[in-house]
């Protein structure tokens, strides 16, 4: 319901995809109540529907007495504020052509008269998408907002619906009704809503992913094609959302609305969701990626200054239970690395990794990290306990990388802790950048979704957005650990 209101205020058409009995027509009846003296028109299309049934019958008296071809439009689409057309794809070509003009220009040619349509939104519905190669592409492209209308999924909500009485008309207070004057005034204010650079960056991220997706094998380019006209309308929809939420600029909480604007086939919806969600954290993700590469580069450059392969010295490192190095700052508790495996682990400067496993050892009350290599004990290579986790290992001077995160081995007291001073500086700079720039900016983004409400985000939109934020927060924490551990390797 909220999205249809948003579409109406933005002057856009909306398509509802879903099976019968999901209250699609009720949406149109309710939406007209938002407008003062609002009129609605609804019709169930069939292959035999004629323009007379949609736009009004031809006036026999005018045709007979004045030789004028003119329709009686009162009570039909040309006089309605909200239009609902069910089974839209069954419309005949003549109806489709008239609808295109009505949607695009908000006019209807009635004989020699050009009628300005009061239509705020055309809501179309069907349980299927338009068939390919039947000339429906132009009409399909005019529906900016595309929503999937499913049956109630929650059992609690289902029985709540069952127990409720029949839905009655809602009386909207007169001071809340949208008048024509107010609607026209809003359009001017909506156009002045600002589009910040961070919004442009998020959309650029989506556009880049759309292009990459369309280049994949066995993918129809048109499945991910979005015209410039459609992008222009998307931004106008976001501006409308910001305006109705009382803002003077679009913010990141408006971006998830694009999920309902960018898919062309139902099969592409999951990919579109991923693209839109990833754009929410694109700034933080890029910063994290750059900082990670900076640390890796600094470690490699300093490592190249040392001769021979990466190694560790027992004289500098603390050995536990005769056979293990203690891994510092492992997030899940005490962690030991089997020292004999170290020489079989790939050096991180090669860009390669060695397979390994992490598993709990109840006797040692610690997590054990082992490398898997030819000649390793059979028991470790085939360990399949539920608590065994497969990891990727790389060695570095004085420590080990586990799934890309460096961990230092515990050193004996008095051991040299400044092997690579410039790396320490790089790690310190990274930590400062994370704490002073990346983290605060991310917290502001997170606050938008957790502590401010966007009227038009569905529960699913919000859930997907928060999931993306959680993934980014996890990457941010991993980056902190990587930077902190890089310091401990020194």
What are these regions (language model features)?
Residues 4, 16, 54, 86, ...:
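Conserved RecA-like P-loop NTPase ATPase core
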Residues 5-47:
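Walker A/P-loop
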Residues 268-490:
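Terminal-proximal interaction/regulatory segments of ATP-powered molecular machines
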Residues 47-78:
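Short glycine-rich substrate-engagement loop in P-loop NTPases that contacts/grips substrate
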Residues 38, 61-66, 82-95, 101-177:
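Canonical AAA+ ATPase core
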Residues 1-7, 71-72:
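Pre-Walker A adenine-sensing motif
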Residues 194, 209-283:
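C-terminal helical "lid" subdomain and adjoining coupling/linker elements of P-loop NTPases
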Residues 1, 147-219, 247-248:
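Conserved C-terminal "switch" segment of AAA+ ATPases
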């Amino acid at each position: 319901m909220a999205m249809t209101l948003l579409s109406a205020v933005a002057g856009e058409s909306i398509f509802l995809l879903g099976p019968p009995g999901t209250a699609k027509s009720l949406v149109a009846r309710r939406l007209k109540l938002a407008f003062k003296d609002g009129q609605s028109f609804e019709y169930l299309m069939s292959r035999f529907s004629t323009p007379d049934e949609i736009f009004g019958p031809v006036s026999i008296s005018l045709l007979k007495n004045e030789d004028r071809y003119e329709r009686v439009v009162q009570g039909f689409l040309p006089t309605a504020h909200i239009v609902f057309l069910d089974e839209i794809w069954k419309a005949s070509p003549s109806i489709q052509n008239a609808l295109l003009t009505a949607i695009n220009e908000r006019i209807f040619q009635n004989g020699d008269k050009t009628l300005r349509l009061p239509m705020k939104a055309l809501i179309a519905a069907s349980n299927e998408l338009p068939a390919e190669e039947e000339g429906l592409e132009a009409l399909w492209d005019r529906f900016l907002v595309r929503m999937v209308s499913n049956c109630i999924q929650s059992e609690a909500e289902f029985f709540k619906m069952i127990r409720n009485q029949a839905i009655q008309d809602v009386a909207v207070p007169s001071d809340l009704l949208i008048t024509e004057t107010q609607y026209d005034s809003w359009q001017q204010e909506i156009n002045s809503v600002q589009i910040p650079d961070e919004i442009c960056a998020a959309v650029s991220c989506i556009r880049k992913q759309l292009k990459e997706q369309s280049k994949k094998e066995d993918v129809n380019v048109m499945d991910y094609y979005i015209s410039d006209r459609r992008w222009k309308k998307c931004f106008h929809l976001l501006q409308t959302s910001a305006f109705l939420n009382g803002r003077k600029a679009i913010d990141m909480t408006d971006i998830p609305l694009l999920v309902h604007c960018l898919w062309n086939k139902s099969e592409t919806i999951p990919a579109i969701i991923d693209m839109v969600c990833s754009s929410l954290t694109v700034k933080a993700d890029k910063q994290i990626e750059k900082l990670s590469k900076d640390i890796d580069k600094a470690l490699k450059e300093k490592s190249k200054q040392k001769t021979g392969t990466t190694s560790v010295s027992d004289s500098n490192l603390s050995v536990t239970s005769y056979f293990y190095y203690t891994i510092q700052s492992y997030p899940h508790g005490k962690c030991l690395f089997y020292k004999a495996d170290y020489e079989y682990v790939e050096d991180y400067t090669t860009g390669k990794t060695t397979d390994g496993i992490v598993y709990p050892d109840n006797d040692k009350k610690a997590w054990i990290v082992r490398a898997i290599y030819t000649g390793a004990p059979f028991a470790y290579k085939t360990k399949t306990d539920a608590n065994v986790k497969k990891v990727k290992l790389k060695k570095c001077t004085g420590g080990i990388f586990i799934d890309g995160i460096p961990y230092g081995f515990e050193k004996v007291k008095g051991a040299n802790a400044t092997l690579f001073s410039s790396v320490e500086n790089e790690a310190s700079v990274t930590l400062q950048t994370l704490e002073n720039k990346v983290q605060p900016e991310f917290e502001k983004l997170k606050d938008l979704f957790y502590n401010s409400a966007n009227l038009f985000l569905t529960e699913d939109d919000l859930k997907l957005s928060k999931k993306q934020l959680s993934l980014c927060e996890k990457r941010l924490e991993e980056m902190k650990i990587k930077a902190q551990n890089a310091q401990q390797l020194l």
